[in-house]
Amino acid sequence: MFCIQCEQTIRTPAGNGCSYAQGMCGKLAATSDLQDLLIYMLQGVSVYAVKARELGVVDTEVDTFVPKAFFSTLTNVNFDDERIIAYAKQAAQYRESLKNAYEATCEQSGKTAEQMPPVAQLVLGTSKLEMLSQAPISLLNKDKNNIHEDILGLRLLCLYGLKGAAAYMEHARVLGKTDVDIAADFHRIMAFLGEPSVDADKLFSTAMEIGQLNYRIMALLDAGETEAFGHPEPTVVNTKPVKGKAILVSGHDMKDLELILEQTAGKGINVYTHGEMLPALAYPAFKKYPHLVGNYGSAWQNQQKEFANFPGAVVMTSNCIIDPNVGQYSDRIFTRSIVGWPGVVHVTGDDFSVVIEKALSNDGFHYDEIPHNITIGFARNALMAAAPTVVENVKNGSIKHFFLVGGCDGDKSERSYFTDLAKSAPKDSIILTLGCGKYKFNKLEFGDINGIPRLLDIGQCNDAYSAIQLAIALSQIFECDINELPLNLVLSWFEQKAIVVLLTLLSLGVKNIRTGPTPPAFLTANLAKILEDKFGLRNTTTVEADLKTMLNVA
């Protein structure tokens, strides 16, 4: 086992990364090894997808399968060995199908089929034991003793960034949005990573390519969400329980939320969003469901307590899931799509009857708690509509600064930095937030500036796209470079989606971003210095010191 993809990975003077019997996330060594093997198989599929495409052979099933299966290897997504094995076997079948199509097309056109790299030739074991015996070939740091540590760090930056992009591709696909050019570029990069490079410049340029690719994917996902559910609008949301039977929907998949709402209508069940599903409450399509009563709980890391106290059924539509046995609710939590936990019921298809039955058999909430409201829904359209008013307030001096404070949440005590930063931001500043990092301060009262709320919740982590559109619009209005705006980005990171959002921002030329609370363990000190020199990327320090720098206070 070697896994170093998330913030909570082991860090010691002897080296970084989880490499023992179990990772800090709870992932067992065998699961980690199987995931690495799955990635290796998927890279082999992409090798053939690239070669087949060169001859005009495109398999759209492969184009959707590879990102989806890759998504299952993100932090806190799938801990079920049998599901990972099934993905690996399916990958082997797709690779063989593409291989046959490629070779047949070569023969028909009189071309000689190319010799493929080892990553496209592995004969997958037939049993779990055989697959685990093959794991060393796919270990991410297998050649660490023969390469510079910066090379390994760059490879991992690319791999983890592409994982995040794959997740957003799958989110878009669920909403019916795919793109053949995006798929082609994804396969090309996936295949490149399958043949470990030692070219630092090529790896760095690939990281920027991944950022650019993800920008296109986020635009695709934005279109999918707004076409399906309308444009989010400022919405007041209750964050306290309401009397009645209950279902909690977590993750990012709003299509699943829609299905659950349709199937629970008239059944006396209240539906709540959780974590990254909170922004769904701002979409017009969901406002026709009176039994979508609000948001329950906070970010992913608190779920073992919050789900244990939730008297109903819980559905995990995507990341993040952690051990449900701790809070003894494994019998009433359900997984969907790429999510998996051993022993937890996995819902396939679009029938949520088993979830509904579980909700009805539980007590539900016995009384209404006193409401606590927050306001959400300041995504792209709402921000653009408010832009003229914002510009006027900037010009008259009422608004002097903007902060984007968001990203992933986590349980490290150092993350109080983000709460303190939001609370310490000057009263003449606007705070934009997104992702589950918002839960560090989204229930606090920040007031307004001439009717403009000082806290603007943009949405899910992928809604960084909305923030980028606002920044571009403001830079055009003020006729300045995006980096000359009175705007500072402070991003909390935990896993691979945050990595690819960061790569997206860097690839667009956004500079002087702060990330925290700790830098990715796979980035060497030298790589961190290069990123600082090139982009002004730096780690958070203290709120007082960072604010002085961001506000240019002497």
Curated annotation (Swiss-Prot):
Subcellular location as annotated: Cytoplasm
Entry EC no(s): 1.7.99.1
Reaction it catalyzes: A + NH4(+) + H2O = hydroxylamine + AH2 + H(+)
Glycoprotein keyword on record: no
Main enzyme class: oxidoreductase
Modified residues annotated as Cysteine persulfide in this record: C408
Keyword flag 4Fe-4S: no
MF (Gene Ontology): 2 iron, 2 sulfur cluster binding; hydroxylamine reductase activity; metal ion binding; peroxidase activity
Residues holding [2Fe-2S] cluster: C3, C6, C18, C25
UniProt cofactor(s): [2Fe-2S] cluster; hybrid [4Fe-2O-2S] cluster
Note on cofactor: Binds 1 [2Fe-2S] cluster.
UniProt-listed InterPro entries: HCP/CODH, Hydroxylam_reduct, Prismane-like_a/b-sand, Prismane-like_sf, Prismane_a-bundle
Gene Ontology BP annotations: nitric oxide catabolic process; response to hydrogen peroxide
Positions that bind hybrid [4Fe-2O-2S] cluster: H252, E276, C320, C408, C436, C461, E495, K497
Entry keywords, A to Z: 2Fe-2S, Cytoplasm, Iron, Iron-sulfur, Metal-binding, Oxidoreductase
Main location as per UniProt: cytoplasm
Cellular component, GO annotation: cytoplasm
Superkingdom field: Bacteria
A Pfam family that the UniProt record links to this protein: Prismane
Function recorded in the entry: Catalyzes the reduction of hydroxylamine to form NH(3) and H(2)O.
Family recorded in the similarity comment: Belongs to the HCP family.
Protein name per the record: Hydroxylamine reductase
